[in-house]
From Swiss-Prot:
Protein name: Probable chorismate pyruvate-lyase
UniProt organism field: Shewanella oneidensis (strain ATCC 700550 / JCM 31522 / CIP 106686 / LMG 19005 / NCIMB 14063 / MR-1)
GO molecular function, one term: chorismate lyase activity
Keyword vocabulary terms for this entry: Cytoplasm, Lyase, Pyruvate, Ubiquinone biosynthesis
InterPro entries in UniProt: Chorismate--pyruvate_lyase, Chorismate_lyase_/UTRA_dom_sf
Subcellular compartments: Cytoplasm
Lineage of source species: Bacteria, Pseudomonadati, Pseudomonadota, Gammaproteobacteria, Alteromonadales
Length: 189
């Protein structure tokens, strides 16, 4: 895996839109994946023999435009979700400092364990709304895909999922790389 042309954090400022606006969504079957209410990790695991989380970086960082405007720093975790050694999803998680100390979740000790397993295994984390974004062929996400030897021929898609814990909110952004979009149409509709 060669991602030397970029450095952590890989994320970029993104214009997200409400998933209810279906005229802006891609064609099926990718649309169903973007709007899937359950764990994306579980859905991905159903399409492969070997699932792997590759950590690109994690640590305290200032949020980007459109992310936590009232926070000066949040915990950022960026990973690749790989199926049978092929990166399918770039995921960026943002956790406010107040949630890092919760006893119900060991965010800092996740290592290569999927975050989805933690969030969907505990009733104290409630899945919330989903927002959608598209990424141009010259975006940082497209550059990341190209550094992974994935050809970016058209815009890419992603979703941002909010999770609530008591009065706190965190979110996970999951961007589908070209390999995922191609395989979803073939392997797991």
């Amino acid at each position: 895996m060669n991602v030397t042309s970029l450095s952590f954090p890989y994320g970029e400022s993104i214009q997200w839109f409400c998933a209810d606006n279906t005229k802006n969504l891609p064609a099926s079957p990718l649309k169903e994946w973007l709007l899937a209410p359950g764990s994306l990790t579980q859905k991905l695991k159903g399409c492969c023999n070997e699932f792997e989380v590759r950590i690109l970086g994690e640590g305290q960082c200032p949020p980007l435009d459109g992310e936590y405007p009232n926070q000066s720093a949040v915990w950022v975790r960026e990973v690749l979700l790989c199926l049978d050694d092929v990166p399918w999803v770039f995921a960026r998680t943002l956790i406010p400092q107040s949630l890092l100390s919760t006893r119900q979740a060991d965010f800092l000790g996740l290592g290569t364990r999927p975050l989805g397993e933690l969030l969907f295994s505990q009733d104290s984390f409630v899945p919330g709304r989903i927002e959608i974004a598209r990424f141009a062929t010259n975006s940082r996400l497209a550059h990341l895909a190209q550094s992974l030897a994935q050809n970016v021929e058209h815009e890419l898609w992603g979703r941002r999922r909010y999770f609530h814990h008591n009065e706190e909110e965190m979110f996970v952004s999951e961007m589908f790389l070209p390999a995922a979009e191609q395989a979803i149409a073939r392997l797991c509709p």
